[in-house]
From Swiss-Prot:
Phosphorylated by TBK1. This is Ankyrin repeat and SOCS box protein 8. The gene is ASB8. Interacts with TBK1; this interaction promotes TBK1 proteasomal degradation. The SOCS box domain mediates the interaction with the Elongin BC complex, an adapter module in different E3 ubiquitin-protein ligase complexes. Pathway: Protein modification; protein ubiquitination.
Length: 288
């Protein structure tokens, strides 16, 4: 082996070792207790190097270290790069930390990036009920009705967990409440699947009431029969049967139609400008 080739290989190995130490330092796995992120980068650690499935920036978002995220971005970390799971850094940050989300968006992170299952960061923020991340993503242009591989929207993901805060914000931004996924489920039916487990909380009940106001009318029965899992709970079954049997009133159907006609925007601002009495504005905003 020539001396020049040996030097090149040694240089590559040294950079790889530094980059691995960078990942470990960010994750607080201190194999080298005196390491710090800035010194490792200054010494030649590659801020975009992948170790296994991890990249440094993804790791910083996993541990919710907004200062480290900003430092890595300043040093050239690629904000929309994919890790070994085909996820961007924003997918990780959206689950956990608004500060990281804000920094990433400031540096050009794509709020509509898709992972391997076509999930967006907004899907994950809604699922984890990280309401401030939901709001930050929507304010930065995230698609409120983005579809994953199963044609579920962020609203569906929030509803299946009974995440009242996230559901409320998504509805404020015009989320479609009657969307149907590939196996016939709607956001409200996803929430019902949670309620039938018998572990419903007051917040989940409030989430159901909010979705019911937004949808106007819904149907869970097939050929006039409630799903078996609903029928097992007589009290819930009776309540849902009454709601499904009642046709949507003109008032509730008009509310749904008006909200939909306003399009994908922040509805509280849009409704504020309508020439309507205050009571009707509150009705349109699902406040009664």
């Amino acid at each position: 082996m020539s001396s020049s080739m040996w030097y090149i290989m040694q240089s590559i190995q040294s950079k790889y070792s530094l980059s691995e130490r960078l990942i470990r330092t960010i994750a607080a796995i201190r194999s080298f207790p005196h390491d710090n992120v800035e010194d490792l980068i200054r010494g030649g650690a590659d801020v975009n190097c992948t170790h296994g499935t991890l990249k440094p920036l993804h790791c910083a978002c996993m541990v919710s270290d907004a200062d480290c995220v900003e430092l890595l971005l300043e040093k050239g970390a690629e904000v929309n790069a994919l890790d070994g799971y085909n996820r961007t850094v924003l997918h990780y940050a959206a689950e956990k930390d608004e500060a990281c989300v804000e920094v990433l968006l400031e540096y050009g992170a794509n709020p509509n990036a898709l992972d391997g299952n076509r999930d967006t960061p907004l899907h994950w923020a809604a699922f984890k009920n990280n309401a401030e991340c939901v709001r930050a993503l929507l304010e930065s242009g995230a698609s409120v009705n983005a579809l994953d591989y199963n044609n579920d929207t962020p609203l569906s993901w929030a509803a299946m967990k009974g995440n009242l805060e996230s559901v409320s914000i998504l509805l404020d931004y015009g989320a479609e409440v009657r969307v149907i996924n590939l196996i016939g489920q709607t956001p409200i039916s996803r929430l019902v699947a949670l309620l039938v487990r018998g572990l419903g909380t007051e917040k989940e009940d409030s989430c159901f009431e909010l979705l019911h106001r937004a949808v106007g009318h819904f149907e869970l029965r097939k050929n006039g029969t409630m799903p078996r899992e609903v029928a097992r709970d007589p009290q819930l079954c009776e309540k849902l049967t009454v709601l499904c049997s009642a046709p949507g009133t003109l008032k509730t159907l008009a509310r749904y139609a008006v909200r939909r006609s306003l399009g994908l925007q922040y509805l509280p601002d849009a409704v504020k400008g309508l020439p309507l009495p205050a009571s009707l504005k509150e009705y349109l905003l699902l406040l009664e």
